[in-house]
Regions:
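Gram-negative and organellar
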Residues: 1-239
Length: 239
């Protein structure tokens, strides 16, 4: 496909139930696709060194509780080692959890509200694109809280959904070397030992969207889904 770094990815998962709690444990090696550098790698024109192709290898445990009644909860815990070709090694831990309450809980109609939270931690900030960096978002602290609202309904021929959320988030990155793998950088480069300052930011955002699908009873064919999404984020950054 023309990528500079090509290797294997995959995963295994096993699911079960315990006291009405559904759970899944998984082990995987997955590509990080947040940039072309992270996903497929790049070649430095000055040194001829190839770097990038970042992969996350680790385990995750997810669980959920929903007996079809008004309340439901879910959680996901994961830990990964993040590596790449000529990219500094990194570690990632993530905890995500949520609660939802069904204000309307009928066979063909449902309205739910909830509270979701995410807590991420990366050992290093390797979000840059210089030699040795990974080109992926990797804050040392990331915390978000969101309040989702979702309504869905179906009839004999139609189904549609409306949803939206309001969220608060905060992130922090530590200072980092511009070139984290010093052995790759020639001594003649004037900024070989340069350091990028850390930063912190807080933000408020919202999402809203709708989707619908028309189904022909006589032919069994589905008309194309029409999806409209709108997103806006307001952020405040400090250094």
């Amino acid at each position: 496909m023309g990528f500079e770094v090509v290797d294997w990815t995959g995963g295994l998962a096993y699911s079960g139930d315990w006291n009405h709690i559904g759970w899944t444990v998984a082990a995987s090696r997955r590509p990080i696709s947040s940039s072309l550098l992270a996903f497929g790698g790049a070649k430095d024109p000055n040194t001829g060194i190839t770097w990038g192709g970042v992969r996350a290898t680790g385990v995750s445990l997810s669980a959920s509780y929903d007996r079809g009644e008004a309340n439901g909860v879910w959680a996901d815990l994961s830990a990964h080692q993040i590596t790449g070709k000529n990219v500094a090694d990194n570690q990632r831990q993530r905890l995500m959890a949520g609660y939802y309450y069904k204000l309307i809980n009928e066979d063909n109609r449902r309205l739910s509200v909830g509270l979701n939270t995410m807590l991420w931690h990366y050992q290093k900030d390797l979000s840059g694109y210089s030699l040795g960096q990974g080109g992926y978002y990797s804050p040392q602290q990331y915390l978000s809280l969101s309040l989702p609202v979702n309504y869905r309904q179906r009839t004999e021929n139609w189904s549609w959904e409306l949803g939206g959320s309001v969220s608060l988030s905060h992130s922090k990155t530590d200072s980092q070397r511009r070139y984290p793998l010093q052995g790759l950088i020639p001594d003649s480069l004037p900024d070989k030992f340069a350091v990028e300052d850390g930063s912190s930011s807080s933000g408020v955002g919202y999402t809203c969207g709708r989707s619908s699908n028309a189904v022909s009873v006589r032919t069994g064919r589905s008309a194309p889904a029409s999806i409209f999404n709108r997103r806006r984020t307001i952020r405040r950054a400090t250094r």
